[in-house]
Swiss-Prot record:
Gene of this entry: hisB
Cell compartments where the protein resides: Cytoplasm
Keyword Ion transport among record annotations: no
Pathway info: Amino-acid biosynthesis; L-histidine biosynthesis; L-histidine from 5-phospho-alpha-D-ribose 1-diphosphate: step 6/9
Keyword terms: Amino-acid biosynthesis, Cytoplasm, Histidine biosynthesis, Lyase
This enzyme's EC code(s): 4.2.1.19
InterPro entries: IGPD_sf (IPR038494), ImidazoleglycerolP_deHydtase (IPR000807), ImidazoleglycerP_deHydtase_CS (IPR020565), Ribosomal_Su5_D2-typ_SF (IPR020568)
One Gene Ontology MF term: imidazoleglycerol-phosphate dehydratase activity
Protein name: Imidazoleglycerol-phosphate dehydratase
CDD domains: IGPD
NCBIfam families in the cross-refs: PRK00951.1-1 (NF002106), PRK00951.1-3 (NF002108), PRK00951.2-1 (NF002111), PRK00951.2-4 (NF002114)
Length: 210
């Protein structure tokens, strides 16, 4: 079960639109701290090097300050750590966004990386849904199981309550496809979480609630 975490070294004084979540199971121990109004500061240590690299993309291109520390049963494989980092990140996003008052809510970006081109569209709708359209040609990038990309986004979507559509428009290199996906996700999320000055203090829904 998640619990509030102590302030991190990266984000010592928690401003509005920031959160810290600590999640412990028999398989993993994960701490995530983030500031949605950050500048891209990042410190991650999950024990899964390729996942660390992708989390850096989220922070850098999403302009969020992000700290992730995780230990898990990676002697078995990376699945539990990968999924639980996604769960905890999703929970931290939901906590930092609160009732989502004043945000754009929707975000969209198409990111190239050499021959790869990936489109991401998302909506902080309060209704979790993932439409996943990557065709990653290899089973692994280094030691990272490429099936875990989808599992990571399933976890983030379900626990942040977002709708997320990922489409691969081009690409043959597995690393490029995955990295373009994380970059596009970061930029789309940056657009969605920005405060719309015209919306002021209202919730971005015709229903009045998300």
């Amino acid at each position: 079960m998640p619990e509030s975490s102590t302030p991190s070294l990266l984000i010592p004084n928690f401003p509005p639109r920031a959160a810290a979540v600590h999640r412990v199971t028999k398989e993993t121990d994960v701490r995530v701290s983030l500031n949605l109004m950050g500048s891209g500061l990042c410190h991650v240590a999950t024990g899964v090097p390729f996942l660390d690299h992708m989390l850096h993309q989220i922070a850098s291109h999403g302009l969020i300050d992000l700290e992730v520390n995780a230990t898990g049963d990676i002697e078995i494989d990376d699945h539990h750590t990968n999924e639980d980092v996604g769960i905890t990140l999703g929970q931290a996003l939901a906590e930092a966004l609160g009732d989502r008052r004043g945000i754009n809510r929707f975000g969209h970006f198409i990111a190239p990386l050499d021959e790869a081109l990936v489109q991401v569209t998302l909506d902080f709708s309060g209704r979790p849904h993932l439409s996943y359209g990557l065709q990653i040609p290899t089973e692994r990038v280094g030691t990272y199981d490429t099936q875990l990309v989808r599992e990571f986004f399933v976890a983030v979507v379900n626990h942040s309550q977002m709708t997320l559509h990922i489409r691969q428009l081009d690409g043959i290199n597995s690393h490029h496809i995955i990295e373009a996906t994380f970059k596009a996700f970061a930029r789309a999320m940056r657009m969605a979480i920005e405060v719309d000055p015209r919306r002021a203090d209202t919730i971005p829904s015709s229903k009045g609630v998300l």
